[in-house]
Amino acid sequence: MSIRLLVALTLIGVLLQTGIGRADAIDGDWCSTDGMRMSISGEKITTPGGKQIRGNYSRHAFDYVVPEGEAGSSEIVNVILRSEYLAMSRQGPADSPLREWRRCKEGIS
């Protein structure tokens, strides 16, 4: 195998792995199985109730306090990325039910 081919294959492998790693982040538009929508961009979120607020962001998780005027006001919502296309959230205490979120097919307007 020539050195050029080996270098090219190595470079392609590195680029593919980098691209996959960047796609695996919680940022984006999310739709719940019960018709709710939210959008996360860094530390900003558009909540299911439509309010734009800030929360605590990490690459694979996000949490925020439910704003006034929305169901469960002042409760904490934790969102965890389970895969590139699946996230789970829990609002309130640890024994509260989980809500399933999937990446939306189109953006939130």
Please report, for each region that a protein language model flagged, where it lies by residue.
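Positively charged n-region of N-terminal signal peptides that target proteins for export
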Residues: M1-L5
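Bacterial N-terminal signal peptides
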Residues: V7-Q17
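Sec/Tat signal peptide C-region and signal peptidase I cleavage site
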Residues: G19-A23
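Tryptophan-anchored aromatic micro-motifs
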Residues: D24-M36
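N-terminal export/targeting and maturation segments
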Residues: C31, G42-E43
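Beta-sheet ligand-binding and adhesion/scaffold domains
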Residues: D34-M36, T46-T47, A61-S109
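Intrinsic low-complexity, repeat-rich intrinsically disordered segments enriched
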Residues: E43-N56
